[in-house]
Amino acid sequence: MTTASSKVAIKPLEDRIVVQPLDAEQTTASGLVIPDTAKEKPQEGVVLAVGPGRFENGERLPLDVKTGDVVLYSKYGGTEVKYNGEEYLVLSARDVLAIIEK
């Protein structure tokens, strides 16, 4: 398991990852402020910790994502967790749809 300079003390198991969702847009292109109640849940976040991978046929399968990656994930995937005042998402690696290269 790797963590982003120990930012989070959550150690994911098997093929799970810990993601910190990125903030959704606060305003529209025309400058209108979007209230919290109307915002879509973010589907983009930074990977903070990665589990060791799951076992298949006695071998551990490595994950495609690594700490620091910015990923797109399934809208309803994962479990929201609040730890030390911060909100995180614990996802199965299967819920990651893509890695965003910036």
Curated annotation (Swiss-Prot):
Organism: Streptomyces albus G
Keyword Oxidoreductase attributed: no
Main location: cytoplasm
Protein location: Cytoplasm
Keyword annotations of the record: Chaperone, Cytoplasm
Protein's name according to its UniProt entry: Co-chaperonin GroES
HAMAP family the record matches: CH10 (MF_00580)
Main function: Together with the chaperonin GroEL, plays an essential role in assisting protein folding. The GroEL-GroES system forms a nano-cage that allows encapsulation of the non-native substrate proteins and provides a physical environment optimized to promote and accelerate protein folding. GroES binds to the apical surface of the GroEL ring, thereby capping the opening of the GroEL channel.
Gene that encodes it: groES
